[in-house]
């Protein structure tokens, strides 16, 4: 008995992945000009950029830790083959070839284009507010350990003799800072802690700008972890928003309650609805801002920014970053936040229909 099957026949008609693939196909269709500029007319056949981006979407949604693990799963997961428009008997990508081709996406800043195209899909559906926003930042642990944090000049701290490669190192009494030390695994990662109640770690800083209507991500950035990174990046993301004639609001936690940030936000055309920090100091905003009902609304809405951060760190696998270097991790962060938006968009499509 001969039976012919395609992956299309095996995916339920009402499976949520169908709605996501439909939006992804539209997004990729808008990026044809970008893809054309990435490849020469001749040369050896390569992994299509559409397949690379679709694979990245699957890796974020299904919490796949590495590119090699994805290629292994692609051998037997028919849903993955369907999402990538592959035949049942079509072999999976070679893991080494797959990883090398993904570097081309980084060179052409494809992650930024993909994120922007997803945001446009949300705007076309009128899911995004253009007046009220929130900003926040978090630390993302780098793919580097404390043992790799060594002096830039001079000998490393003493270790136990004959203890092998993974020997214990005694840092007691040794002053370590980003000025004098750097990670040998990821030199761009910085040793930083967000508060006195948490330990320092080698990390990067992730930043989000969300709107208040449905909590969708308007912009995302990954930078070096510094004391001013959150405020500086928030100002930059706000300035990238299209200008409007009427005044808009931006909410934030107490970390944004500084004179410089409030002044920068006002000059950019926004009213700062940041939480007041009155611990042994005077807040940068006063009753002229906090007396309005909109301020209380912003303080309630700003907590929604924790939802995408939580998703990125758990489902998206970002609690510990998987790449080395700021550029590669930034591209991953852009793609993962775009996937979060994709899931929210398709969920809203179903709820509103």
Where are the regions that the model predicts?
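Basic, low-complexity intrinsically disordered segments
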Residues: 18-127
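Polybasic low-complexity intrinsically disordered regions
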Residues: 75, 84-264, 339-340, 347
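Helix-centered, glycine/charged polyanion-binding patches within enzymatic domains
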Residues: 154-159, 163-171, 254-331
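In a subset of proteins, long, contiguous C-terminal domains/tails are tracked
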Residues: 327-353
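Charged, often Cys/His-bearing segments associated with DNA-binding zinc-finger transcription factors
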Residues: 1-26, 169, 345-353
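Short acidic (Asp/Glu) and glycine-rich catalytic loops that position anionic groups and cofactors
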Residues: 1-3, 31-35, 96-98, 185, ...
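Conserved, well-structured core segments
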Residues: 54, 207, 307-311, 334-339
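Secondary-structure capping and boundary motifs in well-ordered enzyme cores
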Residues: 12, 16, 43-51, 63-66, ...
């Amino acid at each position: 008995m001969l039976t012919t099957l395609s992956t299309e026949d095996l995916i339920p008609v009402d499976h949520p992945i169908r709605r996501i693939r439909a939006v992804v196909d539209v997004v990729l269709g808008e990026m044809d000009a970008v893809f054309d500029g990435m490849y020469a007319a001749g040369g050896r056949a390569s992994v299509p950029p559409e397949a690379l981006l679709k694979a990245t979407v699957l890796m974020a949604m299904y919490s796949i830790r590495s590119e090699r693990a994805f290629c292994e799963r692609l051998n037997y997961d028919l849903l993955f083959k369907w999402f990538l428009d592959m035949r049942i008997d079509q072999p999976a990508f070679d893991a080494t070839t797959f990883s090398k081709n993904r570097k081309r996406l980084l060179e052409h800043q494809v992650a930024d284009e993909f994120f922007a195209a997803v945001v446009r899909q949300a705007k076309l559906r009128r899911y995004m507010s253009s007046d009220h926003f929130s900003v926040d930042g978090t630390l993302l642990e780098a793919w580097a350990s404390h043992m790799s944090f060594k002096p830039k000049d001079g000998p490393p701290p003493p270790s136990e003799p004959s203890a092998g490669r993974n020997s214990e190192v005694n840092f007691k009494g040794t002053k370590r800072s980003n000025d004098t030390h750097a990670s040998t695994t990821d030199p761009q990662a910085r040793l930083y802690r967000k508060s006195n109640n948490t330990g320092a770690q080698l990390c990067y800083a992730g930043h989000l700008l969300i709107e208040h209507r449905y909590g969708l991500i308007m912009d995302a950035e990954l930078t070096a972890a510094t004391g001013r990174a959150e405020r500086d990046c928030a100002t930059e993301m706000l300035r990238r928003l299209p200008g409007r004639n009427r005044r808009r609001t931006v909410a934030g936690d107490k970390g944004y309650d500084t004179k410089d940030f409030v002044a920068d936000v006002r000059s950019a055309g926004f009213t700062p609805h940041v939480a007041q920090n009155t611990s042994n100091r005077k807040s940068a905003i006063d009753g002229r801002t906090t007396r309005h009902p909109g301020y209380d609304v912003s303080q309630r809405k700003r907590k929604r920014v924790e939802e995408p951060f939580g998703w990125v760190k758990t489902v998206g696998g970002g609690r510990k970053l998987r790449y080395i270097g700021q550029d590669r991790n930034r591209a991953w962060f852009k793609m993962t936040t775009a996937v979060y938006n994709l899931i929210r968009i398709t969920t809203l499509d179903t709820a509103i229909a």
